[in-house]
Amino acid sequence: MTSSKTGQITIRSIGAGGDGVANLPDGQIYVPFTLPGEVVNVARDKNRATLMALLEASPERQNPACRHFEDCGGCALQHWQDEPYRLWKRELVVGALKGRGTDVEVAPLVACNPHTRRRAVFAARKTEKGVLLGFNRHQSHEIIDIVECPVTVPEIIARLDDLREVGALLAPGSGPFKLAATLTESGLDLAASGCGKLNDEQRRALTALVIKKDFARLSHEGEIIVEPKKPLIHFGKVPVPIPPGCFLQATAEAEETMAALVLAHLGKARRVADLFCGVGTFALRIAEKSAVHAVENDAAALAALDRGVRHVQGLKPVSIERRDLFRRPLMTKELLPYNAVVFDPPRAGAEEQALELAKSKVEKVVAISCNPVTLARDLAILQKGGYRIERVTPIDQFLWSAHVEAVAVLTKGRQ
């Protein structure tokens, strides 16, 4: 098959992005929504192809959970049965580690349930027929207007029509914008972006609608428009008033799994540094037993963590520091007071911090990541510095996607 033709091919594997991969004489091509062993007709465009017809289906194929699957670009793998899907997702972590020469124990994938994603970032646009609200088509800016989503919590999906009403008031003409909805203990927290400058009339109308529909808050580009209720989320026993758009783990159940792994490894550590701590997802749980130094570059997240600490008694001391750990990692000397370090960086990982940590005498480390490639790089640095990787646990926090969370626990100086 040439680089811009239609033809028949056989899918050999699933790539790291969740697409089927076929090996052709002139290279690999990637075909979304296919499975290993399937024979398909495709329309090829260079190294990508569109599925035109399924000629021979895999016995591992199943009916997708959502009517929007293959139109909506939010999910890649609803059509794959659970067992092979989970083995493949675990292998993303195993393969990344082996690519760095790291052969360690990788636990079975921890499964997560459907209907548990507590934040949805919707693409939206106002049309003559109303507001489109949903997710972009696969590799496109076209918005697929949704009526269901088996990934997201029902409390958000039940409010789609109400969200469209809010979107109608926010819309910047006919241009696209984003509207995120986060489930908190106080109700739905709405955060809009890309709506341009809101005028006074819009603000008054939005305020009235948010109150009428019993949303907890509406913000735009980080500015709070109206906040009838403080959006709260508990981390351990500490209720934290989360700032607009702050980072949260995608599902509460995955967060609990990660926290349990962190706490089990830290054990009786007296002083812990929690790096890239966010709003205190792990720091506030750790503080129930250990003194914690929480480091984060997001001032609003740190302020929220601090407010949470001030309203709860019985915690060990919690100190906070605003710091860009990419530019200014904690140096080896600064790590001397700590028995343990936890770090949960963005997808780029924590290479500079890992280089300093590798030279330290910190006894226990927990590395958390949503990117197996950068996690493997950082773990290889720590391993070279004398750390022993005890175990890596992959967690399917991003159901039916090509993304996977992982928690690695490491020790130094103890056999």
From Swiss-Prot:
Gene3D superfamilies: 2.40.50.1070, Nucleic acid-binding proteins (2.40.50.140), Vaccinia Virus protein VP39 (3.40.50.150). GO terms for molecular function: 4 iron, 4 sulfur cluster binding; metal ion binding; rRNA (uridine-C5-)-methyltransferase activity. S-adenosyl-L-methionine binds at Q249, F276, E296, D344. Signal peptide: none annotated. The keyword Methyltransferase applies. GO terms for biological process: rRNA base methylation. The active site is at C370 (nucleophile). Pfam families: tRNA_U5-meth_tr. It comes from Brucella melitensis biotype 1 (strain ATCC 23456 / CCUG 17765 / NCTC 10094 / 16M). Transmembrane segments: none annotated. The keyword Transferase applies. [4Fe-4S] cluster binds at C66, C72, C75, C149. This is Uncharacterized RNA methyltransferase BMEI1496. It comes from the Bacteria. Belongs to the class I-like SAM-binding methyltransferase superfamily. RNA M5U methyltransferase family. Keywords: 4Fe-4S, Iron, Iron-sulfur, Metal-binding, Methyltransferase, S-adenosyl-L-methionine, Transferase. Its EC number is 2.1.1.-.
